[in-house]
Design a protein with these regions (language model features):
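Residues lining the SAM
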Residues: 15-19, 48
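A short acidic, Gly/Pro-enriched loop at the edge of an enzyme's catalytic core
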Residues: 4-13
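A short glycine-rich, Lys/Arg-flanked "PGG" loop and its adjoining helix->strand segment in the class I
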Residues: 28-44
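C-terminal lobe and adjacent flexible extensions of AdoMet/dcAdoMet transferase-like proteins
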Residues: 123-173
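A short hydrophobic/small-residue beta-strand
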Residues: 45-46, 148
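SAM-dependent methyltransferase
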Residues: 49-136
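Short, hinge-like loop/turn segments at secondary-structure boundaries
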Residues: 13, 62-66, 167-169
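A short His-aromatic
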Residues: 20-24
Length: 173
């Protein structure tokens, strides 16, 4: 998202659950700048981030004893998702590193496609993500040029609370 160039401008851009996956904070800021440049005047950028502190599973990964146990083992394959062609798809995820000082994590993803009991495709890759809190993202949006910025919790009309799992930002160009 940090390097896209599109031939026109948009009234709305929505980043759903993927902000912070550009690989670095610099690239994340560049993503916001690109979004700003691809919006019409008075256009809106909407994006959501997880409130890490609402999940004990996520928050505990910041503790030394949990970081020292990384990388996490691959989870069991679990149930397949069956596609319309009958093929079965498996996805596995694991955390291999969390850096509380840099507010970042590294996750590995393993995907498999099976057809008639045979593995026909597989891929494995690594994602580096950044963890953001409300005020840091507000500042980044201002630096990117946005003027009116509101924050809501869990896709409601009200302001966020400390118990809501998602923060939803609306930033106007």
């Amino acid at each position: 998202m940090h390097a896209f160039e599109l031939p026109r401008k948009y009234k709305t851009i929505y980043i759903c659950g993927s902000f912070g996956l550009a690989g670095s904070r610099e690239k994340d800021l560049e993503t916001l700048r690109h979004c700003y440049s691809h919006l019409e005047d008075d256009g809106a950028l909407l994006l959501n981030i997880e409130a890490e502190y609402t999940s004990s599973e996520s928050w505990n990964l910041w503790l030394p004893e949990h970081r020292q146990a990384m990388p996490q083992p691959w989870p069991e394959k679990g149930d397949a998702r069956v596609a319309s062609d009958g093929s079965e798809h498996f996805a596995q995820f694991r955390i291999v590193d969390v850096d509380p000082l840099e507010q970042s994590y590294t996750r590995q993803v393993r995907l498999e496609k099976w057809s008639n009991g045979e593995l026909v495709a597989s891929e494995e890759y690594t994602l580096r993500g950044s963890i953001y809190f409300k005020h840091e993202l507000l500042l980044m949006l201002k630096v990117a040029g946005f003027r009116e910025i509101t924050v809501h919790g869990d896709y409601t009309d009200g302001p966020p609370t400390t118990d809501q799992e998602e923060l939803v930002f609306t930033a106007i160009r």
